[in-house]
Amino acid sequence: MSAWRKAGISYAAYLNVAAQAIRSSLKTELQTASVLNRSQTDAFYTQYKNGTAASEPTPITK
């Protein structure tokens, strides 16, 4: 059985953890903004009324 299955996580979550570990292990001169920004996700939501968009997409913030 796979290690990620034994850990009880999905394959996508396993890949996310592995990618984050690789990015954090890079030498500091290779940790550029473009590399570190790959782990960020942008999410937007749109309100709908009667099947049409009632507003522009709004970013979800923490």
From Swiss-Prot:
Pfam families: ATP-synt_Eps (PF04627). One of its GO terms (cellular component) is mitochondrion. Keywords: ATP synthesis, CF(1), Hydrogen ion transport, Ion transport, Membrane, Mitochondrion, Mitochondrion inner membrane, Phosphoprotein, Transport. InterPro entries: ATP_synth_F1_esu_mt (IPR006721), ATP_synth_F1_esu_sf_mt (IPR036742). It is found in: Mitochondrion; Mitochondrion inner membrane. GO terms for biological process: proton motive force-driven ATP synthesis; proton motive force-driven mitochondrial ATP synthesis. The keyword Transit peptide does not apply. One of its GO terms (molecular function) is proton-transporting ATP synthase activity, rotational mechanism. The modification Phosphothreonine is found at T52. CDD domains: F1-ATPase_epsilon. Present with 4280 molecules/cell in log phase SD medium. F-type ATPases have 2 components, CF(1) - the catalytic core - and CF(0) - the membrane proton channel. CF(1) has five subunits: alpha(3), beta(3), gamma(1), delta(1), epsilon(1). CF(0) has three main subunits: a, b and c. Mitochondrial membrane ATP synthase (F(1)F(0) ATP synthase or Complex V) produces ATP from ADP in the presence of a proton gradient across the membrane which is generated by electron transport complexes of the respiratory chain. F-type ATPases consist of two structural domains, F(1) - containing the extramembraneous catalytic core, and F(0) - containing the membrane proton channel, linked together by a central stalk and a peripheral stalk. During catalysis, ATP synthesis in the catalytic domain of F(1) is coupled via a rotary mechanism of the central stalk subunits to proton translocation. Belongs to the eukaryotic ATPase epsilon family. This is ATP synthase subunit epsilon, mitochondrial. The lineage of its organism: Eukaryota, Fungi, Dikarya, Ascomycota, Saccharomycotina.
